[in-house]
Amino acid sequence: MITVLTAGFGAIWGAILRYGITNYGKKHWSEKFPYATLLINLTGAFLLGFIFSRKFSPFIYALIGTGVLGGYTTFSTLNVELLSHWRDRNYSVFTLYALLSYGGGLILVFLGYKVGTLI
């Protein structure tokens, strides 16, 4: 039960951080491309790869990996934004966003893992 509560506590902080970045992006970045979600998901992928490479206790992994980074990253928002660009026939943004999100996420999770193994 303590692990579930730990993950939930971490998720609160991850969601607060995501909310802050998303609102900052709405005020300061172009609305033509979902920069905030891309930034959130790519940094989250890197950090999760890093966390995964380290020998943390299950408690810390639940707090940071499952909790904070689970609350921070947003797979569902990514896919809704992709659908929106497809629906609006904005195929160039759709393609670029999909490639950067999925390809970049995969590259950054491996890079985060590699950095974590070197430290």
Swiss-Prot record:
Segments crossing the lipid bilayer: 1-21, 33-53, 56-76, 93-113
Any one of the GO BP annotations: cellular detoxification of fluoride
A single GO cellular-component term on record: plasma membrane
Catalysis performed (reactions): fluoride(in) = fluoride(out)
Ligand binding (Na(+)): G70, T73
Alphabetical keyword list: Cell membrane, Ion channel, Ion transport, Membrane, Metal-binding, Sodium, Transmembrane, Transmembrane helix, Transport
GO molecular function: fluoride channel activity; metal ion binding
Membrane topology of the entry: Multi-pass membrane protein
Record's subcellular location: Cell membrane
Highest taxon of source: Bacteria
InterPro entries to which the protein is assigned, alphabetical: FluC
Activity modulation notes: Na(+) is not transported, but it plays an essential structural role and its presence is essential for fluoride channel function.
Record function comment: Fluoride-specific ion channel. Important for reducing fluoride concentration in the cell, thus reducing its toxicity.
HAMAP family (UniProt xref): FluC
Family from the record: Belongs to the fluoride channel Fluc/FEX (TC 1.A.43) family.
This protein's name: Fluoride-specific ion channel FluC 2
